[in-house]
Each structure stands twice: as structure tokens, then as C-alpha cells.
């Protein structure tokens, strides 16, 4: 009897795996198929003439990795609005509206973390500390605790590193903002552009514990620390409450090739093969045409999606989006002398 059940489970799994058609990730056929489905979102071309290895490397998060301790639930104690956008709630915190570019490196796990940490540092200091926390510092200096740099990592390790070792400031590539700006250049998704071509060959830069020339204070003095870091349960209300009270969070989910074509609307997987795990920053929620969504920021530059942002189905743990939420609270006492 139990052999029959196992066989049935396998058959169902195989059937499910083939429910959705498969297309080349960069094909017009994939885009056209999605747009003919009368689904909740629209597809378009975000990438031209890039290596498939590059597309897969963009998805550099190891799903199901180490877990941080959970925080005490408080979602039932908060009256939550139907729609929320952290960019509007904390309009004095400019990093919330920023879109970064991870380049040819599987560093999404680091970007999702430093973006949310930057936002929360501003939020928890009432707008007094506006800092772009360095993805470079986290990517290159966290080590094995965070995974394998450009070859993929763990969001939980990123937040733990922030609380234990701290992170310096650092803006986007060639910005000369902060102690350690990002050293991996953006690459060209489009045919006629000035950026270098996108490949899957990016190596992890080495850890450099000194700020770029002309910047002060020193690397050690520039560190920003977290007071605590934790995981948030997959309860929709708890995730919403966390964002509403403390600011954007880092989330991770399984990317399928149709996500690469997202342009607008509420993303729901329709077609294509699995590309890998991907980390992003979730900054709000809402309802569009009756469909509940999470509002999120990607790290594939402004050319991708809806000016770098996207919406994804909320409430069904779609592609695992509600399974791996991590966050933390900044150590604000380190700034007291500055106010």
C-alpha cells in the first residue's frame, strides 16, 4: 500500500513539474506566451545578448540555509493598512527608493541585506543617519559564515555579520560615496549601451579593511552595527507588521525564467525553468486589480522591471517568497554623540 502512495506522489510531482511550459529564458516566445495568458502581470525584454551563466549567477542565494532565531510575534497587536509603501511612510530616508546593481556577481544575498539595513538605520534614527551601507564590505569580508561571495550566500549570515562585526558605508560602483563603494561594475543588459557585457565569470573581490583614499573616518571607526538580527515567521500578518513597525526586510524566493521578463503588474509564475534562489528587499504591500501583492526592490539596475521594482503575489507563499524573511534592529546608541 505504501509503495502505491510513494508512486502516486512521484507521479504527481512529475506532473506538477511539467504543468508549465518551458522556453528559452531570452526568447520572444516566452514573452509572447505570458502576455497571451491574460495573467496578473506583463512581460517584456529586460535582457539582450547576455550569457545564460550570467542570468543564473544573478540568483545567488542559497535557499533553505542557516536560520536566525525567530522574534516574538506582535502582528495581532497592530492595525495594518490595506496598502503600505515604505518610500512614502519614511520619505526622509532616501535609500528606501534606491535601486542598486549587483553586476556580474551572485551577491543578491548581500544587496538585500545592506539595502534593508541602510533603510532601517535611517528609520530608527528618525532620519538623522542617512547612510548607504556597503555591499562590498559584506560581500568580501563576511567569509564562510555568509557562503561563497559571488558564487552565492546566506541572507541570515549577512544579518548576523552586521550585528557581530558591523558594516562600513559604501555607495554604488564608481560613486566615491562612503568608505567602501562597490567595485564590480554594472553590466549591459541591452544591445547598444556603454556598460561592459554581462557574463557569469565575476570573481569575488578580496576583503579590503581600509577605506578608499580621501575618505575619513577610518575603516574601523566607520562601522555601523546591528543590535539584533532575526528571522520572521511566514505569517503574512507578521511580515507586514515587521515592515510597518521597523522598515523593509530581506526576503528570498525561487526564480523561474519568466521572472526575468517582468515589466509590470503582480508577478505569478507562468512558464519557464527554475534559475535559482534570489534575495531581494521587501518594502511594502497592496492590492492591484483584486490581487494582493508584496512590493519589492531588485538589484538588477533601473533597466529591469518597473524601474528596478516589482510586485509579487502575496499570501500564498508564492515561489517561497514568505518563507525566508530576515531582518534586524540597528544599534542606535552608537550615534548618540552625533545628534
Swiss-Prot record:
Residue span(s) of the pro-peptide: 18-79, 334-339
Cysteines joined through disulfide linkages: 93-122, 105-150, 141-207, 142-146, 179-211, 187-198
Enzyme class, first EC level, given as a word: hydrolase
Phenotype when the gene is knocked out: Enlarged thyroid follicles, reduced extension of the thyroid epithelium, and increased levels of Tg/thyroglobulin in the thyroid follicles which fails to assemble into multilayers. Lysosomes are enlarged and CTSK/cathepsin K is absent from the thyroid follicle lumen and mis-localizes to the apical membrane of thyroid epithelial cells.
GO molecular function, one term: proteoglycan binding
Positions where N6-acetyllysine occurs in the chain: 220
GO terms classed as biological process: cellular response to thyroid hormone stimulus; collagen catabolic process; decidualization; epithelial cell differentiation; proteolysis involved in protein catabolic process; symbiont entry into host cell; thyroid hormone generation
Entry keywords, A to Z: Acetylation, Cell membrane, Disulfide bond, Glycoprotein, Hydrolase, Lysosome, Membrane, Protease, Secreted, Signal, Thiol protease, Zymogen
Membrane topology of this protein: Peripheral membrane protein
Organism domain of life: Eukaryota
Localization: Lysosome; Melanosome; Secreted, Extracellular space; Apical cell membrane
Gene Ontology cellular-component annotations: apical plasma membrane; collagen-containing extracellular matrix; external side of plasma membrane; extracellular space; lysosome; melanosome; mitochondrion; peptidase inhibitor complex
Entry's EC annotation: 3.4.22.1
Family matches, as CDD domains: Peptidase_C1A_CathepsinB
Reactions the enzyme catalyzes: Hydrolysis of proteins with broad specificity for peptide bonds. Preferentially cleaves -Arg-Arg-|-Xaa bonds in small molecule substrates (thus differing from cathepsin L). In addition to being an endopeptidase, shows peptidyl-dipeptidase activity, liberating C-terminal dipeptides
Sequence similarity: Belongs to the peptidase C1 family.
Subunit description: Dimer of a heavy chain and a light chain cross-linked by a disulfide bond. Interacts with SRPX2. Directly interacts with SHKBP1.
Descriptive protein name: Cathepsin B
